[in-house]
């Protein structure tokens, strides 16, 4: 048996061996014997630890109060709950009071990593949950990656958690090729869980809610990842989640038409890599933030969405910027913050009469595995700026291993000008990955000439330098393509790598800035040029 196999009020030598539960190395004494707390009332040391040399006999030899028993029970449990799970089990071996709080541990994150296990996880999880008192359980997270587990066990664990009144429940099932996916027991969640669960995360299983299960009165966050659920099943489920505020769907391949019913509390929606999705139709009146990652879809919003992020780097088509300019406005006319990430633009952004009347923040990123198409005219981005009379911040980011556009260097023809436009509210402009492409130089010159309220202009000739004092923009999710062509996430404090022609192009960009831009910057505008540092070089990444 293990520590979690102990019955209430009894601590045997086997029960006190955390190493047997977590397969740890020898543990040091947490406290000297004089500071150990006594066994529970009515139990003697001989009754608790009958075997000579047991860990309990060594650690709990004092009948004096000591330090731990002087603390109120709720404080002692709070201290115990703050420990990592392995350390919490060790502490339970050294103290009867911690053993009692172990059986009421509020936050159970059960995985190979959390428990420090290399071997069997299923039996350990089963012991922990079967012997939990059912009191105080607030969070249960089961990460069962790579483990063969019978659905009987998972059903039992969910039943235990729901009966205990768990508030946060996360079930991540293993993906085993050739094996039928786990069918999540939805009915168990409505056996009391509808009145306690506030957060639900389900991954790698089928989720088939049926009509008549009931209403989820407490659920505020729902995350479904790699879940098999049909359109009507999801719509029916959401109709019963009256308190939901945050909804995320990832890799849900059965969803074709995502219908969001009238959910007054829903403010955040993220949809990622749902490969068959074609339409998102939302009636949620207070939806304010929408994030789309993957392919393009038709968007119909019945609310004033303020924040939109569209990223199609993975498995997405090109021309996302064009899509945002031509089609997004009809679905979200009141957007105030727009972030667009595109793998490439093959067609220039068209000039249209439609307006983003409330847009204040615009961040456009072109992150290509190859060169950005030379057919794309960077100056056409004026279409976005012109359509946004309230725009205050514009960030344009270009990442490409090579530059194929016509360079301004060696080109004797005059720069194009668009005299009919003025941008009265634009205050801050940042261009990352600035190069010598003539149309990009023309865009920078246009902004200098037409942005009458411009306060700061930053031209970063690196791919996003992160050296102290040289950071052009903070962006939590940064992606880049490696030399082998794989898309990789960059650590937030690292410079994105540059190599070969990219480094050479940064020198040409600096020359273009000196010749065509620097001397045009009006007095009073803060003008900053950021060049690659030693950390931007690929070998140092």
Where are these regions (language model features)?
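Conserved hydrophobic beta-strand positions in leucine-rich repeat
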Residues: 108-111, 138-143, 167-172, 198-202, ...
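C-terminal capping region of solenoid repeat domains
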Residues: 1-58, 322, 392, 402-411, ...
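Short amphipathic alpha-helices and their capping/turn residues within compact interaction modules
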Residues: 84, 96-97, 103, 107, ...
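Plant-skewed but cross-kingdom recognition/interaction modules and surfaces
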Residues: 153-156, 205, 214-305, 372-377, ...
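Extended repeat-based solenoid scaffolds, especially LRR ectodomains
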Residues: 297-374, 387
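Leucine-rich repeat
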Residues: 4-9, 14-20, 26-29, 36, 74, 82, 90, 102-105, 115-126, 131-137, 160-168, ...
């Amino acid at each position: 048996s293990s520590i979690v196999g102990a019955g209430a009020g009894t601590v045997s030598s086997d029960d006190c061996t955390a190493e047997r539960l977590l397969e740890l190395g020898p543990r040091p004494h947490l406290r000297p014997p004089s500071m150990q707390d006594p066994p529970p009332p009515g139990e003697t040391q001989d009754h608790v630890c009958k075997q000579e040399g047991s860990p309990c006999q060594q650690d709990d030899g004092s009948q004096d109060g000591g330090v731990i028993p002087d603390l109120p029970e709720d404080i002692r449990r709070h201290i115990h709950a703050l420990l990592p799970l392995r350390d919490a089990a060790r502490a339970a071996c050294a103290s009867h009071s911690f053993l009692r709080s172990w059986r009421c541990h509020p936050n159970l994150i059960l995985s190979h990593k959390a428990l420090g296990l290399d071997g069997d996880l299923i039996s350990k999880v089963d012991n922990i949950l079967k012997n939990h008192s059912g009191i105080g359980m607030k969070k249960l997270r089961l990460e069962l990656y790579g483990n063969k587990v019978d659905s009987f066990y998972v059903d039992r664990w969910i039943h235990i958690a729901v009966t205990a009144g768990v508030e946060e429940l996360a079930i991540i099932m293993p993906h085993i090729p050739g094996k039928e996916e786990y069918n999540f027991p939805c009915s168990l969640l409505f056996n009391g869980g509808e009145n306690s669960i506030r957060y639900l995360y389900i991954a790698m299983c089928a989720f088939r809610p049926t009509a008549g299960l009931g209403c989820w009165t407490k659920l505020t966050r729902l995350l479904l990842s790699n879940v098999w659920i049909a359109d009507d099943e999801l719509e029916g489920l959401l109709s019963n989640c009256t308190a939901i505020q945050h909804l995320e769907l990832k890799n849900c391949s059965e969803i074709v038409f995502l219908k969001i019913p009238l959910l007054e509390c829903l403010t955040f929606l993220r949809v990622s890599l749902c490969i068959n999705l074609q339409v998102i139709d939302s009636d949620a009146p207070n939806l304010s933030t929408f994030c789309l990652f993957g392919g393009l879809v038709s968007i119909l919003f019945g609310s004033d969405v303020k924040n939109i992020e569209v990223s199609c780097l993975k498995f997405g088509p090109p021309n996302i910027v064009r899509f945002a300019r031509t089609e997004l406005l009809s679905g979200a006319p009141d957007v105030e913050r727009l972030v667009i990430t595109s793998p490439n633009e093959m067609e220039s952004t068209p000039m249209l009469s439609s307006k983003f009347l409330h847009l204040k923040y615009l961040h456009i990123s072109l992150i290509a595995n190859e060169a950005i198409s030379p057919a794309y005219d960077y100056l056409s981005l004026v279409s976005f700026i012109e359509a946004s009379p309230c725009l205050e911040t514009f960030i344009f980011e270009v990442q490409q291993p090579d530059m194929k556009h016509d360079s301004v260097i060696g080109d004797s023809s005059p720069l194009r000008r668009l005299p009919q436009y003025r941008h009265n509210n634009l205050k801050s402009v940042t261009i990352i990955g600035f190069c010598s492409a003539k149309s990009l130089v023309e865009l920078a010159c246009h902004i200098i000439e037409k942005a009458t309220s411009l306060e700061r202009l930053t031209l970063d000739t690196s791919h996003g330098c992160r050296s102290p004092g040289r950071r052009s923009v903070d962006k939590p999710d940064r992606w880049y393509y490696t030399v082998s062509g794989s898309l990789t996430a960059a650590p937030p404090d690292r410079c994105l790598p540059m190599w070969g022609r990219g480094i050479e192009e940064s020198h040409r960009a600096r020359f273009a800035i000196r010749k065509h831009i620097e001397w045009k910057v009006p007095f009073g505008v803060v003008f900053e040029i950021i060049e690659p540092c030693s950390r931007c070089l690929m070998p140092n990444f």
